[in-house]
Amino acid sequence: MLKMGVVLFIFLVLFPLATLQLDADQPVERYAKNKQLFNPHKRRGIILRAPGKRCCHWNWCDHLCSCCGS
């Protein structure tokens, strides 16, 4: 009877606990949530730097940069 109790305990308690997905096992979702908290102006700066364009004052806008708006 003791062996059957141990087997039941393993399959009914320990096995389901080992197969649960914890929040810490999902780093992609946490990273996406953290990225949404960026200031919109910071995101714009990151996006502008990606293609290599600069952000210029609205008086100095030309084909080498894009206007910042302020």
From Swiss-Prot:
Residues 25-54 form a propeptide. The cysteine framework is III (CC-C-C-CC). Classified in the M-1 branch, since 1 residue stands between the fourth and the fifth cysteine residues. Expressed by the venom duct. Disulfide bonds join C55-C67, C56-C68, C61-C65. It comes from Conus marmoreus. Keywords: Cleavage on pair of basic residues, Disulfide bond, Secreted, Signal, Toxin. This is Conotoxin Mr3.8. It is found in: Secreted. Shows a very weak inhibition on Nav1.4 and Nav1.8 sodium channels. InterPro entries: Conotoxin (IPR004214). GO terms for cellular component: extracellular region. Belongs to the conotoxin M superfamily. Pfam families: Conotoxin (PF02950). In vitro, inhibits proliferation of the mice ovarian cancer cells ID8.
